[in-house]
Amino acid sequence: MAIPLVLVLAWLLPVVLAASLTQVNNFGDNPGSLQMYIYVPNKLASKPAIIVAMHPCGGSATEYYGMYDYHSPADQYGYILIYPSATRDYNCFDAYSSASLTHNGGSDSLSIVNMVKYVISTYGADSSKVYMTGSSSGAIMTNVLAGAYPDVFAAGSAFSGMPYACLYGAGAADPIMSNQTCSQGQIQHTGQQWAAYVHNGYPGYTGQYPRLQMWHGTADNVISYADLGQEISQWTTIMGLSFTGNQTNTPLSGYTKMVYGDGSKFQAYSAAGVGHFVPTDVSVVLDWFGITSGTTTTTTPTTTPTTSTSPSSTGGCTAAHWAQCGGIGYSGCTACASPYTCQKANDYYSQCL
């Protein structure tokens, strides 16, 4: 029986396999002993962007790849995904050692930067379009990379994290053995103090810091919601931004988007009643990175800042400019240094402005 010519030709055509998550064993110096996985779509953009996606404690690159679908949009927009995988301290990333917190100091942060350099070199990726995101430990690492390697990353989106250097000296990264004062929201500094930590991570750096987007649930019992306020204080001080106003029920009902400046450099999301794992809205993250929108747009708040009277605080202490001064669960200074007043962003966070 003769085989139809069309079937013969079809059999001879090359089979195009779907892209998949692939481990890279030799990406360069790896002081953090991390594993590297990448997703490279079959059709890359010209000078593709890079997104580094970092898992929570106890997780892995493969698990985080399956949790949030960044790979389907990668097929459409042609960007490359890097999934680092931690191997120590209950698979938590090192956000506590001076090595990881310091530019070119070593440990996990340098391993991740070397992964980025490998992808830029191997695939011709755009070094000006390197982004990062993560949940819990991955969100903490997003803050670490923003402080230690601001010249590598253009933007970041952190879900349930804490400020840069909040875990400094904790002794370990895992949630069981490490010092719990930061995760319980007990470490509170002024914006200037938090900013000093960042500047110490990369002495002499005078360039721009990554655009940052922070997400946190008000019912988080693993990493205190108070840490969102400290993140806000740290990065708005670094960027010199003031609170502009809120957008309620954005992007979901019960979520409040807190806008700083014109909204193009820093924004924070408060998720009412949400616990430790704030669901990741991939479309919002990609828009923030400028991958789907093509540019970073400014936003106009639907509410304006509410100025509240600064009450006297215990011990007569005063909060400095940019510092937190109120909110549910907050126990620090509630009076602001003159001439600033305590302005309410939402029920959980007020700031001296």
Swiss-Prot record:
Involved in degradation of plant cell walls. Hydrolyzes the feruloyl-arabinose ester bond in arabinoxylans, and the feruloyl-galactose and feruloyl-arabinose ester bonds in pectin. Binds strongly to cellulose. The keyword Signal applies. SMART domains: fCBD (SM00236). Belongs to the carbohydrate esterase 1 (CE1) family. Feruloyl esterase type B subfamily. Glycosylated. The lineage of its organism: Eukaryota, Fungi, Dikarya, Ascomycota, Pezizomycotina. Residues 19-291 are annotated as: Catalytic. Induction: Repressed by glucose, probably via the carbon catabolite repressor protein CreA. Its EC number is 3.1.1.73. This is Feruloyl esterase B. Inhibited by the specific serine esterase inhibitor AEBSF. It is an enzyme of class 3 (hydrolase). It is found in: Secreted. GO terms for cellular component: extracellular region. It comes from Talaromyces funiculosus. The gene is FAEB. Residues 317-353 form the CBM1 domain. It catalyses: feruloyl-polysaccharide + H2O = ferulate + polysaccharide. Keywords: Carbohydrate metabolism, Glycoprotein, Hydrolase, Polysaccharide degradation, Secreted, Serine esterase, Signal, Xylan degradation. Residues 1-18 form the signal peptide. NCBIfam families: esterase_phb (TIGR01840). GO terms for molecular function: cellulose binding; feruloyl esterase activity. The active site is at S136. Glycans are attached at N179, N246.
